[in-house]
């Protein structure tokens, strides 16, 4: 529709070893020269379109090549943004690596395709992509970053455990509550993403 190829969606390439993703059609001609540059930068991506109304441009990101660097990546988020990843298990680390890699993909695309006068907004949904937003805030601060959460980590944890959510909200200490429910790292990333968003 209205945005044509200026609205680009990014998702994880979860079908990379199986049959083709039925929701995605790769397009070898779309951003062809940038894809070559991205590959030279160590980014493994597929570019094409989602098979939904409007067929928006989509980039699928294979983040697995960054798994060996996870400790350095998590350390950098602590040093730059004080994101506490110490208690994060694989259900935390995997989304952090996806978000980080998505941020690197956006950085590569912007540096290759976008003039300094063009305005770019990158929107990140949920804590699972917050690392991408934080990466961009450091690497390309000129990109406007929006962070959207549809339900917070703590809100889900509180409600999911049958506790009252809205009336006693002021009584919940975020750090203590996150620790109580074992979501310290997720809550830390989410709160830092919200803090650093534009």
Where are these regions (language model features)?
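Catalytic cores of nucleotide-sugar-dependent glycosyltransferases that transfer UDP/GDP/TDP-activated
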Residues: 1-198
């Amino acid at each position: 529709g209205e945005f044509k190829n200026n609205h680009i969606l990014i998702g994880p390439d979860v079908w990379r070893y199986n049959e083709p993703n039925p929701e995605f059609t790769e397009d070898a001609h779309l951003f062809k020269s940038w894809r070559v540059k991205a590959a030279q930068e160590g980014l493994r991506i597929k570019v094409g379109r989602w098979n939904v109304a409007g067929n928006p441009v989509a980039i699928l990101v294979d983040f697995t090549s960054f798994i060996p660097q996870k400790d350095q990546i998590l350390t950098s988020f602590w040093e730059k943004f004080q994101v506490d990843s110490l208690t994060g298990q694989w259900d935390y680390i995997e989304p952090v690596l996806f978000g980080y890699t998505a941020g690197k993909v956006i950085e590569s695309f912007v540096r290759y395709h976008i003039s300094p006068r063009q305005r770019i907004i990158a929107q990140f949904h949920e804590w699972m992509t917050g690392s991408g937003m934080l990466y961009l805030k450091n690497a390309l601060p000129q990109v406007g970053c929006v962070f959207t959460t549809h339900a917070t980590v703590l809100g889900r944890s509180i409600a999911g455990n049958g506790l009252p959510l809205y009336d006693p909200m002021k009584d919940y200490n975020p750090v203590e509550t996150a620790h109580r429910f074992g979501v310290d790292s997720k809550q830390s990333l989410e709160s830092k993403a919200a803090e650093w968003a534009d």
